[in-house]
């Protein structure tokens, strides 16, 4: 399993675990590493099944598998107490980790959910089914070429075309088995933050970050989830798209750091 653990010089610093979205790669968080390493031990990891060499994921693959993977990694690294920051799918992994495995040996200090939802929005479903059709009928290159349209604002795409082309070429060379992508998408489309999980979240410091120009997940989904969590924080940004951790990294980093300071362990 691929992971990177960046240790702070202060052994007593808290841990922060970053979990990426559908792509599954820890490298998604490059724009966060330098900032967060100044204050925390930082763990990033690749979710299983996300590389060209990956084995096929099990039938019925679900968030139980995704959360168990993190739990086992944390046990391997002897990490007991930690903040968890997740982007979309990655945030749901954090919810499942808290709901299924919270114990004296697995304690979430806080949970940050970026562009999350309580249940799948019809617009998001339409985006996902479009991506599935592209993958199945047009292939990997078309799937990756369209990906930026869902992640980034139009102006940002215009200004970063060369970078996106480089990234797409790199991703195509290490694209996972199509079956794995489809199983992960299926798990994501079925996931719901039900009443039991809402009750779990009420026991945690939670911060929701959403972008009004998100072309994949309507920001009202984060708003609706926030209304179910009386003590949660909501940070609503006008710009940045679905991947605002990339497009508006400085602002999003500061929001996340400010939240972690308010939920620091005592």
Swiss-Prot record:
One of its GO terms (molecular function) is hydrolase activity, acting on carbon-nitrogen (but not peptide) bonds, in linear amides. InterPro entries: AB_hydrolase (IPR050471), AB_hydrolase_1 (IPR000073), AB_hydrolase_fold (IPR029058), Pyrimidine_utilisation_RutD (IPR019913). Gene3D superfamilies: alpha/beta hydrolase (3.40.50.1820). Keywords: Hydrolase. Its EC number is 3.5.1.-. SUPFAM superfamilies: alpha/beta-Hydrolases (SSF53474). One of its GO terms (biological process) is nitrogen utilization. It catalyses: carbamate + 2 H(+) = NH4(+) + CO2. It is an enzyme of class 3 (hydrolase). Involved in pyrimidine catabolism. May facilitate the hydrolysis of carbamate, a reaction that can also occur spontaneously. Belongs to the AB hydrolase superfamily. Hydrolase RutD family. This is Putative carbamate hydrolase RutD. It comes from Acinetobacter baylyi (strain ATCC 33305 / BD413 / ADP1). The gene is rutD.
């Amino acid at each position: 399993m691929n992971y990177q653990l960046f240790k702070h010089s202060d052994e007593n610093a808290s841990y922060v675990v970053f979990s990426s979205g559908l792509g599954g790669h820890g490298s998604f968080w490059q724009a966060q590493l330098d900032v967060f390493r100044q204050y925390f031990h930082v763990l990033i990891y690749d979710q299983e099944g996300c590389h060209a060499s990956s084995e096929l994921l099990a039938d019925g693959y679900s968030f139980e598998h995704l959360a168990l993977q993190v739990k086992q990694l944390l046990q391997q690294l002897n990490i007991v107490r930690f903040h968890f920051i997740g982007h979309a799918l990655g945030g749901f992994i954090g919810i499942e980790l808290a709901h299924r495995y919270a114990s004296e040996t697995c304690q979430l200090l806080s949970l940050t959910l970026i562009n999350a939802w309580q249940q799948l929005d019809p617009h998001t479903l339409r985006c996902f089914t479009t991506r599935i059709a592209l993958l199945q009928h047009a292939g990997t290159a078309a799937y990756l070429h369209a990906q930026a349209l869902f992640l980034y604002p139009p102006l940002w795409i215009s200004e970063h075309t060369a970078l996106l082309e480089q990234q797409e070429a790199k991703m195509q060379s290490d694209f996972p088995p199509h079956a794995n992508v489809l199983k992960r998408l299926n798990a994501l489309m079925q996931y719901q933050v039900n009443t039991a999980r809402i009750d779990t979240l009420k026991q945690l410091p939670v911060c929701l970050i959403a972008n009004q120009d998100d072309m994949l997940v309507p920001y009202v989904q984060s708003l609706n989830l926030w209304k179910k969590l009386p003590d949660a924080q909501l940070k609503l940004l006008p710009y940045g798209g679905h991947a605002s951790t990339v497009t508006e990294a400085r602002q999003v980093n500061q929001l996340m750091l400010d939240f972690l300071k308010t939920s620091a362990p005592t």
